[in-house]
Structure formats: structure tokens, C-alpha cells
A protein has these predicted regions:
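Short, charged recognition helix plus adjacent turn
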Residues: 72-99
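Short, basic-rich loop-to-helix N-cap that marks the start of a DNA-contacting helix
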Residues: 50-63
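A short, Lys/Arg-rich alpha-helix, primarily the initiator
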Residues: 1-25
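Short basic helix-loop element that most often maps to the first helix and adjoining turn
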Residues: 17-33, 91-99
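Helix-turn-helix DNA-binding elements, focusing on the entry/boundary residues of the two helices
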Residues: 19, 30, 41, 55-58
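Short alpha-helical DNA-recognition segment
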Residues: 27-45
């Protein structure tokens, strides 16, 4: 993927499009999804239109669509770009967690 395609706003738009697609595949109206996951229908509508939503509301929608494990896996493994970055990560692992 091109570096210019890795912008947060594009990710937000893609996530919103994917959520809308899952909702429509399941034949759910926004109101029905809202009742199931506890996120107000106007919030779902705004998310689908703009990509903007709170993390809590996004998680509620994703869990309703059974994506708990996939969301839990985000940021769960180490990623690095250079050998220097990997060395730094390994050094930091020896530090006390949370400090």
C-alpha cells in the first residue's frame, strides 16, 4: 500500500464503509443496529457518512458484528521498520512494564 494511502482519514472512511456493508449484509436498519449495540442511530449515520465515531461506539458496533477477537488483536504484536528500531524494541522490553 502506498504511503499516501495510509492516512488516518482514509482508514476511518474504510472502516465506516466496511461497517455499513456488514450492516446491510445482515439486513439491519440503523435503528435496529442501534437497539442491538446501544449506539444511537444518529451516531451510526454520522459514522457511515463521515467516518467519525468514538472508540467506544466503534467497539460496540464491531462486537455486535462479532469482531471482538479481530479488534483485540490490533496492536498486539510488535511491528518495526528497521533493524535499529527492532534493537530499540528489544532493549525496551527489558525495562519494567508500564514505565
Amino acid at each position: 500500500m502506498d504511503i499516501y494511502e495510509r492516512q488516518p482519514d482514509l482508514l476511518m472512511t474504510r472502516l465506516a464503509q466496511n461497517c455499513k456493508a456488514r450492516r446491510l449484509e445482515k439486513g439491519l436498519s440503523r435503528n435496529t443496529l442501534a437497539a442491538k449495540c446501544g449506539v444511537p442511530a444518529p451516531t451510526i449515520e454520522r459514522f457511515e457518512r463521515t467516518g467519525k465515531i468514538s472508540l467506544e461506539s466503534f467497539c460496540r458496533i464491531a462486537v455486535e458484528f462479532d469482531y471482538f477477537d479481530e479488534l483485540s488483536a490490533i496492536l498486539s504484536r510488535t511491528k518495526y521498520s528497521t533493524s535499529e528500531e527492532l534493537e530499540s524494541i528489544n532493549r525496551n522490553r527489558s525495562r519494567i512494564k508500564g514505565r
